């Protein structure tokens, strides 16, 4: 990626003094079921005057119930003095204490309780309560929620619409102990020794909760022998980045216990994704308990989670990982509780689409315009290398640990070639390594990892890429393997071998701007240049509002 260009947006009218930008740190619960009405709380900063809620997609209706800012110490002292006076009055004449005074005393106690339980992080100290109604036909999936204030809109938060019954734990503000400081990072935190009893839930269910320091949230349910239980935790999926939490997000861990309290399964991740997924075939009828906690027992209001729990469909892998645009591709599907091991997918346009067989989790499916081919075994040596006609995208697998796939192609002197693997970016566990040699075995290029700045949430950019001008006419060999010598049916890949296809993508930061009248607003436009594209890029506002 070349340095970002600075685009300056100027809105008409007079300049005003800049105000703090509104910020949303979390929404809880972070979703709800079709056909239900419920309340959510948004925690953030500079939310005073909030006047609207924007939720992407149709079928969901929202309204603001209440804005609440954190109380100052001086205001708390005033309330304490008022409470003392009311208590004196009550003690002096208990039998004749007016009902209105009792109500006022209870309200003061509630406000003081909120004061001592307030978040220690100013970035989530203000709250907005919102009413949400989801139409029965609202499309399930993830949406974006933002708040609008006189000073602009907040950053977006993930908000999920589901089809399963939901159970929501009381907000952390209502259940945490008075006087407890709650930074996201705390030293020497250990699990709570006074854990509450498990909460009973009925499968299938989506469980909403917030993890506090040292807490382990427990949920008990009845399960029958032979049930194929799936527990899917969403944590980083909801809030990808928490600035003062290491490694930068809520790292959830799941544990499953039987009726005797024995741990029978555990997960603190799924494949290379930080959010854990647990699969367990129930061996006997009984009561089971699912537990969730932070991996190092941190916690705070913005450690929000959703657990999908039940005999649910879950896709663990597909093959091939993509297909040609406009063509019908037969896809093998692997996973749990799936009605069919196959589906047919027709890619619409070049890019990456999401497919969700049988209302399961969504998995990426790459679509391209180049010819497609399947890897043909055996092809693990130069002697049986699979011949390629360029350009082509090969769909293959590293079938076993230590396996490698070898391909050969013919080229002329001066030909420029690109060999690029797409695997990790398509949810494959493959950590590819790619090697190019000439016909005599001389190594011309090798690559393990290539960073793709368009895949920002990947913690390991494991896909390989080689771009090289070939020195002579002849036959060339590509060797593709797993850098960790792993392999298996899930280790799928797409290997593009072609001449360069120069192109670019743009990303704009920040994700939203707040433009007051007369203000000059800088935004950064990042150019992701593909296959050596080095041309100029003209940037302009599309459908710009009047005055910009």
Regions found by a protein language model. Give the residues of each.
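Predominantly extracellular/luminal regions of secreted and cell-surface proteins
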Residues: 157-202, 359-392
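Acidic, Ser/Thr/Pro-rich low-complexity intrinsically disordered segments
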Residues: 19-90, 99, 161, 200-360, ...
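Ligand-binding face of N-terminal immunoglobulin V-set domains in extracellular IgSF glycoproteins
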Residues: 34-44, 55-57, 77-160, 278
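Extended, compositionally biased low-complexity polar/Lys-Gly-rich tracts
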Residues: 122-139, 143-147, 187-210, 253-256, ...
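Sec-dependent N-terminal signal peptides
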Residues: 3-13
